[in-house]
Amino acid sequence: MKITHVSIRNFRCIRELDLELGDTTVFIGPNSAGKSAIVDAIRIVLSRRWGQRGTGFTELDVYRPDEGGDPKTLPPVMIEISIEEPSAGAWDADMVAALDDIMTLSGAKNIIRLRVTCAWSAEKDAFDPLWQFLTPDGDPMTGRAQRATNLTGFFHYLPVFWLGALRDAADEFHSRGSWGRLLKDVRIPKELEEEVLKTLAELDAKVIAADEKLTKIAEQIGHSTHVAIGDSPGSARLNMLPVAIEDMLARSGVLIQNEALRPWLPLGHQGQGLQSLAVIFLFQAAVSQQLLEAESGMEALFAIEEPEVHLHPQAARALWQRVSTLTGQRIMTTHSPYFVQHVPLRDLRIVGLRGGKSVVASIPARTVSTVPWTESVSKFIAGAQLEGIFEKDPASGNIAAKSWFSAEYAEKLAGCFKGDADATTKKAEIEKLRHKCRTMPSAEDEVELGFHGRRVRGEIFFARRWLLVEGVCEHLLVHAIAKALAWPLDEHGVTVIDFQQSGNAGIYPALADAFGIPWNMIVDGDAESEKFRQQIMDRGYNEDDLKLQFTMHPKPQDLEDNLVALGHEPLLRKILAQIQGKTALTCPTAEFMARLKNKKTGYMSTLAPMVAADQVLAAKMPKAFVDLISGYKAKKP
């Protein structure tokens, strides 16, 4: 049983938010954007403790549009979760029978909807939470569904395990923490217990007998019974070792040896990164132990905040493999680009704050059209082996797409309706579907990003804007221009992506639009620019989409041609002479240009610092770069 949809209203910084959740969902974004609020909303809904003193709901959880808002009079908090069976009959039969009172049907599939609200009650003089199971129409269920045992049973089958970012190994590896709860399930055979306790008693006696001061201390303490009781004084003895197995387990701890020749040290004496990792592994062990005893049908939800805390990049990358194998549904937040590098694109949710309200962007799993799925369509899809792109939407019976598709496929789909009276209308609808799907990566795209874009993929999703350029030279130059114009790109959240080194030119505009990230692309004015433009258009973009975002240097110039046309040949000859010798100062122009283009990174590594230090020189750099950065500065994106 997994949560498929979450609806949040008037909770903390969230005014209105609807989310689709998968088996794994990773929330990323800037601080205070609402990531933890989303996790807490889900956690509170699945909590067993209700009322202001137990749920986590307080007046501070009510969304306030301004600082003068009174939580008592503002709209109430409302959190709603939907849990839909993945396919008919997929859920455990015993669980379905146990939760029958609160289940409804969506087609042939079972579905559970739970709504939690929290509003001010003048009668109770407190914020009063209310939880209700809902009908498919969103109305509260009545009758047997209102029994309190239904909520208890529901929580039993969907337990939530939360691990916050501020985890403390000292707290968790304590008898009252996860460590203690894990040890409570330890069972030692009675014969072994008796043998251990006998051995401990003998060792205890030897330790005390080793120094007569210990015996005298015990005798002195024993006098306290005479003062307290009076008539029949007792005695006291020192206990140096545990007297019961429970005591021994309670005193247990963890020692770690980092390398074979290093000493064994307590966990508390290790670094913060190792302690944080240890807590995660303890969390996994404790939950796994608990789930071993779970009934059939129970499926846990893991809510983990910033699993990468204190870890170095390689460890953060490796950690994804660990947490992604947790059995159940996984919801995580992270600020680590290294952790994000391995997260599948469709598992990412980018959280932002706009106008004081949280917004979330993601890649849709599929897009449904208004065009019906016919026998002709089915034959075309099967014959062309396009099941990975198209499918029939079971709810509407229409064509649904799972990734972008080419104009050729759109034309052939339209051909399936060429004899229909409304063939023109259906062709237009297919074109609309293609345009909507332009932001959805294919399986090949994900592989390409994983291979080419690993070095930038994690970082780019934390940026406020993407600037796409062809290569390393452009990357260095735009950073230098921005610095000279007193508007450093990194400080303003602009990531520069040299897309030729990191995948197909069409992938990044599509991803940017899917995640709501503004983008611009600047390319050379040569023949290659048309190839890049076409790669974007092939995904379903149109001319209007690219009008303000795709810019070229003057045709037919590439970057070096443009720099020379702007009058920088003398400066570039001097730079090239430092690299290749004085012949660069006097060689023919054609030879000079060939040599310059053959030493792109070499000349730019010298030119870029000069540009960064000279605002006048920066203003004379290629117009496309200067105008764009000046525009950024004026708009302050």
Give the positions of each predicted feature:
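Switch/communication elements of ASCE P-loop NTPase nucleotide-binding domains
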Residues: M1-S47, Q257-H435, T439-A443, V447-V456, ...
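Conserved P-loop NTP-binding catalytic core
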Residues: D40-A108
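Conserved nucleotide-binding/hydrolysis micro-motifs of P-loop NTPases
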Residues: I44, I83-G89, W120-K124, R167-A170, ...
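Short glycine-/polar-rich loops that comprise or flank the Walker A/P-loop
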Residues: P75-I79, N110-L114, H156-V160, E299, ...
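Extended helical coiled-coil dimerization/tether regions that scaffold
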Residues: A169, H174, L182-I304, A395
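Acidic, divalent-metal-binding catalytic cores of TOPRIM
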Residues: R354-P637
